[in-house]
Every structure is written in C-alpha cells, then in structure tokens.
A protein has these predicted regions:
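Acidic, proline/glycine-rich low-complexity IDRs
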Residues: 1-31, 39-142
Length: 142
C-alpha cells in the first residue's frame, strides 16, 4: 500500500488551531480552507478544497489526488479530473493559499454546474472566491 507522505490541514469553523488552540469561527457556513502540504517533493503544487464537506470526504478527495501524483500523474490548472466522483469530473483551478500556488479542487453542484454558471447552487458557487477573502471577518486563528 502506498505511503501517504503529505498532510492535510483543515481550517474550518469549530476546529481548534493546532498551533494556538483558538477555535475558528470566521468562515461562511459550508466553507473552509482544507489543503495539503507535501506535494512539493513530487514537483507538484499542493491541493486545496474550500467546500466544508465531511472530514472523511475531504481526506478522500485530497488523498486520491495525492496518490495519483505520487504514482506519477501531473495535474495543472484547468484540468478536468475523472475518477474522484462516479457521476462528474472535478476541475482544478490555480489559487494562492498563504503565499503559495495551489490547485483548488472545484466540485460541480448537484446539477453538474460549476461556479461560473449563474445558476450554480450555494455553497458550490462560492468556490472561486480567493482564499484571502473566504473569511467573513478578520478574526480567526493564527
């Protein structure tokens, strides 16, 4: 079995910061900043997901992409990636996350509409918001 040699950090409402212990409370409902650290060793950008779905689903999506990179697959902004969900691809878009470029996983809504579609459902429609604008207020954890 392949070794997962990266980490996933989830910054979300109700989650205590591992560094300072403060509990996050500044994201809109259903939004978070989940991302990997460790893809650099594969000469690949890390991944980010901003929909606050279950931690298990976040882990599944980010680890599935990480395992594919570990196996030699390379992704770039604009790619439509099959095989994460049975009924639709996900798209990878380039975003900044704490000063580094990441590939954000963009998941279509229940009608398979991506966020640029004016009929895209919330919270899926929120996925194109820049990372530094995801929070509702300046507070939050360190």
């Amino acid at each position: 079995m392949p070794k997962l040699d990266w980490i996933i950090e989830i910054i979300a409402n109700g989650v205590a910061c591992a560094k300072c212990g403060r509990v996050e409370d500044t994201f809109p409902e259903c939004i978070c900043n989940a991302h990997t650290h460790g893809m650099k060793k594969y000469h690949h950008p890390d991944f980010q997901l901003v929909l606050h779905i279950s931690d298990e689903d976040i882990g599944y999506i980010l680890n599935s992409l990480g395992l594919r990179v570990q196996a030699g697959e390379q992704f770039k902004a604009g790619d439509l990636v099959e095989g994460i969900f049975e009924d639709c691809p996900v798209r990878l878009d380039s975003f900044q996350e704490t000063g580094r470029e990441v590939l954000r996983v963009i998941i279509p809504d229940s009608q398979n509409r991506f966020p640029e579609d004016p009929n895209c459902e919330y919270p899926y429609s929120f996925q194109l918001v820049p990372t530094n604008m995801l929070k509702q207020s300046e507070g939050g954890v360190c």
